[in-house]
From Swiss-Prot:
It comes from Xenopus tropicalis. Positively regulates lysosome peripheral distribution and ruffled border formation in osteoclasts. Involved in bone resorption. This is Differentially expressed in FDCP 8 homolog. GO terms for molecular function: zinc ion binding. InterPro entries: C1-like_sf, DEF8, DEF8_C1, Multihaem_cyt_sf, PE/DAG-bd, RH_dom. Coiled coil: none annotated. Belongs to the DEF8 family. GO terms for biological process: lysosome localization; positive regulation of bone resorption; positive regulation of ruffle assembly. A zinc finger (Phorbol-ester/DAG-type) spans 134-185, 364-424.
Amino acid sequence: MEYDDKLVRFRQGHLNPFDKQGEAERQPAACETEPSKDFPTSSPLSVPEFHCPDRVMDLGVSEDHFSRPVGLFLASDIQQLRQAIEECKQEILELPEHSDRQKDAVVRLIHLRLKLQELNDPLEDEPNLRILLEHRFYKEKSKSVKHLCDKCSTFIWGLIQTWYTCTGCSYRCHSKCLNLITKPCVRSKVSHQAEYELSICPEAGLDSQDYRCAECRTPISLRSVPSEARQCDYTGQYYCISCHWNDIAVIPARAIHNWDFEPHKVSRCSMRYLALMLGRPVLKLREINPLLFNYVEELVEIRKLRQDILLMKPYFITCKEAMEARLLLQLQDRQHFVENDDMYSLQDLLDISSGRLGCSLTEIHTTFAKHIKLDCERCQAKGFVCELCKEGDILFPFDSHTSVCQDCAAVFHRDCYYDNSTSCPRCTRLNLRKQVQNPGEEP
């Protein structure tokens, strides 16, 4: 009898997880059942509790497969957001007009309303897509690649965890971290405000940041208490260890002012921004640092090659063979080279410094010149004959030994043009023709 009593008590304490009917009879409120009074908490027969998120994170398993349905969280979040919006409105009305605190409150109100709108919108037809704060998150299918979550800074175990990547800025995070993201996609900043910080490490000090991380506002200090402060060499601001992983990148201001391409430590946000801006031609070197051309010979060579390519472009646009051969597509990676000669991207400066751009651009320049001067009879027919010396060789405006009249675009030998710089025969002829056609007009 004593053994039977122990067996009954054992069965009462250790429930069969697959015996749903018996469990429903014994536990009418399975989600929030108070511990039995018959068995104290310290009793070895008590049912163990497994609701310990800290322990789960220690094991590296951050997915909660026993959480409540998404709809329950959604309703709660919408109610909290509406309450926060009303409180933010009241705060804006109470703050002084045009104050910094009021401006910050307005920005916070905008983000709250955007978040509420995102929750109210119906779900996408494609379940693998999530749109948050202009991020376009796609569910990753890779199970073997291991990355770090940009939000919680822990490993993403693709075999047992669901994770997403933003197609705009390559932001990676767990599925559970999606709703915790507060930073908009940096691609929106690149689209609306495509410019660099041109001051070298513009530091303002931790006091200007209220001793908080510039991105997530976590308290930080240079003494690592409560958290280590890490400086971003691009923005000059300080960040916590979750927002600054000691990534390194080339700083545009150092490259332009010092011709220094040594990578420096930057925050995660700055690294993503610099990566997106790397190929954008937003640097006008003549205005930012015109003296750079006096000290960097490679820049002068590249500028001459680009000027020649712009002079070749009209020949290709009006040449059927060149259009069929798609010669201009050889510069499709640097489209700005066929549009202007003074805009550069940071990638251009990197390639100039390493010598790669000079070699590749010289080959393209040779191919273009060969088509115009040797391969294509139509392009050859558009050449010029020097009207000053009357020699028979055909001249083109991109030849190194020629000069071009600024008024009529006629091409002459450089020596002939400078020896007779007082007058251009073609300009004189055109002026006489105008006088004959319009005798009443003054030349």
